[in-house]
């Protein structure tokens, strides 16, 4: 962490030596006839300095050897130090900043020599009493900063902070001007004080340990600024892209897995042993995706950053709910993936033998193993957001290790073993010499092709999640060690938005999000786009019933249109043939009666 004790002298040096030396030189006009009166250029974006704290921003004094940009950079540094540290809390008031700005950019006036007709620019310096009040409120001792400091040049001493007036030596003449009372500026301005520069957020802590536990992150000790949320690990647009990726995949996986659960588990007329396992795997994936969908509906950034400058913690219900759900469902996913890998391998290995239905044992064991760790974690207030987390997760590494990665790693290894055994069986099938056994096993292999593909796809995602998390934990010191450099960047950079902590590559984090949210999409590609799914929906009772209703409605509409057409034609015929005799009408009725008899006979045969 950055030491406040080491930084305090720097501030005083800036006040007394670095900038005072420049400005002191500039007030002796025989030495600086190139000084000018300029209009204040305005503060740097996101960094409040002197906007609203100048008596006359349209006319400020700038000497010939300096520039507004250079002076502003020094002023920003002093202002950053004052804002950053709690030791200067009493300095954060309009009077301090009015004095600072009157010193950095003194009001400029012009004087024209009546003899030489040369116009000179000269500054109106802040008064001694204003400086004295500032050192008192900031609790700065006179040994570090004396308001009686004088600058001597060519055997003439000038006060940096004049008590009443300043005499300017202009050629052979002298010109006297009253000092500027900066308290009048402070009392008349309505500008609110920017306590911390972005991306830091102002927060006065009375109990830093408690504040850290509820989501505040302090970049240094003895500071009133906390790290903004989202954390400055990536740029704002990069965080938005990460959140957008998570939202889209969560909603998509949620919808697709819900469709598959309904298809294979509810409307499926013949639920097989593998269908039961797949339904449980898909239900687990649905819960996993639903945890992300909850964040989406609540606003992902709002969930992870419930307050400005505070990351989500155990006191935020939505964060806790999504973390708890993600924890349990992820353990369910890896368990049912392991069960599926075992069942596929064992079915091919024991081809021709009747398999027992072990579903109820799998169900009871998986529920116990999956939900005990989350229950323990939630009782210990372990779920929270964090600087690098795109979702709410376990806070401490030990809980992540024993409550999640230990069971996850065990089932990942077991599933990997079954996957290797499955590959061996495939090799045996391909290279086997016994034709009958080869044909029967190849038939089973063809039937289990999709479960095999799904196992490989799930395994690749789960393995990446495991490797990435372990790598992050092993390199955490890289990010924490970058905090002092980050704090220094905030204090010295002209654009604080360019200051970032060291972070994992954004591509790796993006693929991490992809891997944890994409399971539902993979499942739909494998099981949703299939002949079996089409057949289940095609012959489903409700689909058939709705289809019949639509067909009846279509037929009725067609018949009605045909009847209307016939009636219209008959009406036209009557009007045209109104003079026809009764013999013709009788003959038409007889012909109609014969045709109706034929139609009835045909319907009877069909029935």
Swiss-Prot record:
Annotated protein name in UniProt: Frizzled and smoothened-like protein J
| Recorded GO CC terms | membrane
- Which terms does the UniProt entry file under GO BP? cell surface receptor signaling pathway
Which intervals carry biased composition (Polar residues)?
A: 593-607
User: Which key words are in the record?
Assistant: Disulfide bond, Glycoprotein, Membrane, Receptor, Signal, Transmembrane, Transmembrane helix
User: What positions does the domain FZ occupy?
Assistant: 32-182
Q: Topological domains (Extracellular): residue ranges?
A: 27-247, 298-330, 380-401, 473-508
Q: Where are the transmembrane segments?
A: 248-268, 277-297, 331-351, 359-379, 402-422, 452-472, 509-529
Please list the GO terms describing molecular function. Answer: transmembrane signaling receptor activity
Locations of Low complexity compositional bias? 559-575
- Position of sequence motif Lys-Thr-X-X-X-Trp motif, mediates interaction with the PDZ domain of Dvl family members: 532-537
* InterPro entries per the UniProt record, alphabetical: Frizzled_dom, Frizzled_dom_sf, GPCR_2-like_7TM, GPCR_Fz/Smo-like
Q: What are the annotated disulfide bridges?
A: 37-108, 50-101, 127-179
Tell me where it mainly resides.
membrane
User: How is this protein situated with respect to the membrane?
Assistant: Multi-pass membrane protein
Per the record's keyword annotation, is Phosphoprotein included, yes or no? Answer: no
What is the annotated signal peptide range for this record? Answer: 1-26
Q: Where is this region: Disordered?
A: 559-607
- Matching Gene3D superfamilies, A to Z? Frizzled cysteine-rich domain (1.10.2000.10), Rhodopsin 7-helix transmembrane proteins (1.20.1070.10)
Q: Which residues lie on this side of the membrane: Cytoplasmic?
A: 269-276, 352-358, 423-451, 530-607
Residues of this chain annotated as glycosylated in UniProt: 63, 133, 155, 164, 190, 222, 298
Return the similarity comment.
Belongs to the G-protein coupled receptor Fz/Smo family.
Entry comment, domain topic? Lys-Thr-X-X-X-Trp motif interacts with the PDZ domain of Dvl (Disheveled) family members and is involved in the activation of the Wnt/beta-catenin signaling pathway.
Q: Write out the annotated subcellular location.
A: Membrane
Q: Which gene encodes it?
A: fslJ-1
